[in-house]
From Swiss-Prot:
Belongs to the GTP cyclohydrolase IV family. Pfam families: GCHY-1. This is GTP cyclohydrolase FolE2 2. Its EC number is 3.5.4.16. Signal peptide: none annotated. The gene is folE2-2. The record marks C166 as: May be catalytically important. Pathway: Cofactor biosynthesis; 7,8-dihydroneopterin triphosphate biosynthesis; 7,8-dihydroneopterin triphosphate from GTP: step 1/1. Keywords: Hydrolase. Converts GTP to 7,8-dihydroneopterin triphosphate. One of its GO terms (molecular function) is GTP cyclohydrolase I activity. It catalyses: GTP + H2O = 7,8-dihydroneopterin 3'-triphosphate + formate + H(+). The lineage of its organism: Bacteria, Pseudomonadati, Pseudomonadota, Betaproteobacteria, Burkholderiales. Gene3D superfamilies: Urate Oxidase.
Length: 316
């Protein structure tokens, strides 16, 4: 085995590299070239979250030189692998890596590089009421870092799952119950509280509003000079704006508290998008919001987008 490896190593010294020696057919510049879906262990430093996460990375550089046949993907891979050295992800670290990628491709006249990281941030979440009860919730995260010349840009996208109850459906349900109550007691001049309580116990849920699991996908620009990513803070702000994030471990008291939260947080998809956008505008740069309610009434979803007033409302 050792002899075979030594022989292969000796042969490698003379291996051809056609990306350097062969001419590019067509002689056209390429906007981006690189790799997608690279498995990578990274460290994310967020309070109350698991530090070690499994990420999927996409990495590319531009190829403006029309005569160059191909880039050096192994160089990109090696530099990307440096993110797995145990240092927590940060804007400065991502910028250094992208700068090194550009520098490694000077022979390709490369001026720009970008990386996208996808992973789940696993956060510990406590129950609404029951003391000592908690569970883990995974939040999908996407980081997009780009270096174009000397300009570095970094955006973070998080997905938050919540419950939404339809205001229109709630109003129709209340109307039905109101009419049923009048049918039962409208002819009586005086009604005993115990009779009302007994009626409510049996009929208060004669009509229920439809609710559904929903998701908010939020994207914000992060400062290039930031020391941390601030992902959990962003997630917390979104959940607080919505008021009804899905729960992990619950007992009956927690489930009841969640029902109360839903009853006090009726929202259309438009309401959800506006709430989240308003909660982020004063704290985060260029927030963009996309919400989706997976309707239980319909076989289709309700969706809404929001962006800063000075920008177009494109998708996250």
């Amino acid at each position: 085995m050792e002899k075979a490896l030594h022989r292969i190593s000796s042969m490698n010294a003379a291996l051809p590299d056609i990306s350097l020696t062969d001419a590019a057919p067509g002689r056209r510049p390429l906007e981006w070239v690189g790799m997608q879906g690279i498995d990578l262990p990274v460290v994310v430093a967020e309070p109350g979250c698991r530090r070690d996460v499994h990420a999927r990375a996409d990495v590319q550089v531009d190829l403006p030189a029309p005569q160059v046949k191909g880039i050096h993907m192994s160089r990109l891979y090696g530099l990307l692998d440096g993110l797995a050295d145990g240092e927590a992800l940060s804007p400065a670290g991502l910028q250094r890596m992208l700068r090194a990628m550009v520098d490694s491709h000077r022979d390709c006249e490369t001026r720009s590089a970008r990386v996208r990281l996808r992973f789940d941030l696993l956060a510990r979440r406590t129950a609404l009421v029951t003391e000592g009860l908690a569970g883990w919730k995974a939040y999908p995260v996407r980081l997009d870092a780009t270096l174009a010349g000397d300009a570095f840009a970094l955006r973070a996208q998080v997905t938050v799952v919540y419950s939404s109850t339809c205001p229109c459906s709630a109003a129709l349900s209340r109307h039905w119950i109101e009419q049923a109550f009048l049918t039962a007691f409208g002819h009586e001049a005086r009604v005993e509280p115990t009779a009302v309580a007994a009626w409510l116990k049996r009929h208060a849920m004669a009509a229920t509003p439809h609710s559904q699991r929903s998701e908010a996908v939020v994207s914000v620009a992060l400062p290039a000079d930031g020391t941390t990513l601030g992902l959990l803070d962003l997630i917390d702000r979104v959940e607080q704006a919505l008021g009804t994030p899905v729960q992990t471990a619950v007992k009956r008291a927690d489930e009841q508290a969640f029902a109360v939260l839903n009853g006090g947080n009726l929202m259309f998809v438009e309401d959800a998008a506006r709430r989240v956008q308003a909660a982020l505008e004063d704290r985060h740069a260029s927030p963009r919001v996309r919400v989706r309610h997976l309707e239980s009434l319909h076989p289709h979803d309700a969706v809404a987008w929001a962006a800063p007033l000075r920008e177009g409302a494109d998708a996250c």
